[in-house]
C-alpha cells in the first residue's frame, strides 16, 4: 500500500517504513504527526484518487529529527560593473519515518 501526500507545498509518494525529509513541521522529536492531506491511496485492489483529498485517509509518521539542510549559496553580479552580492541560507527540515497509512 502506498499514499501520495502533500505537505509544505510538495507532494511525496510514501509507503510504510519510508524516511522522507519535509519542510519544517512544528513537532517535537520522537512525537507522532498525522498528515491528513492524502491525495491518493494505492492498494492491491486499485487506486483511490481524491478530489482534492481522499476522505478519511491519513498517514501517521514519527518525527525522527529536526535539522537544517546544506547551505544554498546565492551569488548575484553584474558584469564589468564590480557589483557582487553573496547570500546564503540553510533551509530547516523535518525527518519523518512513515509508520502507518490509513485509508
Curated annotation (Swiss-Prot):
Record family assignment: Belongs to the bacterial ribosomal protein bL21 family.
Record HAMAP family: Ribosomal_bL21
GO annotations of cellular component type: cytoplasm; ribonucleoprotein complex; ribosome
Ribosomal protein among keywords: yes
Physiological role: This protein binds to 23S rRNA in the presence of protein L20.
Key word Nuclease present: no
Subunit composition and interactions: Part of the 50S ribosomal subunit. Contacts protein L20.
GO molecular function: rRNA binding; structural constituent of ribosome
Descriptive protein name: Large ribosomal subunit protein bL21
Transmembrane segments: none
Keywords of the record: Ribonucleoprotein, Ribosomal protein, RNA-binding, rRNA-binding
Biological process annotations from GO: translation
InterPro entries reported for this sequence: bL21-like, bL21-like_sf, Ribosomal_bL21, Ribosomal_bL21_CS
A matching Pfam family: Ribosomal_L21p
Amino acid at each position: 500500500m502506498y499514499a501520495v501526500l502533500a505537505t509544505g507545498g510538495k507532494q511525496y509518494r510514501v509507503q510504510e517504513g519510508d524516511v522522507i525529509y519535509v519542510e519544517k513541521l512544528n513537532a517535537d522529536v520522537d512525537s507522532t504527526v498525522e498528515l491528513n492531506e492524502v491525495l491518493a491511496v494505492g492498494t492491491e485492489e486499485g487506486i483511490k484518487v481524491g478530489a482534492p483529498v481522499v476522505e478519511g485517509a491519513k498517514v501517521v509518521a514519527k518525527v525522527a529529527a529536526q535539522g537544517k539542510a546544506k547551505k544554498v549559496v546565492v551569488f548575484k553580479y553584474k558584469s564589468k560593473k564590480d557589483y557582487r552580492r553573496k547570500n546564503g541560507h540553510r533551509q530547516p527540515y523535518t525527518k519523518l519515518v512513515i509508520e502507518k497509512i490509513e485509508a
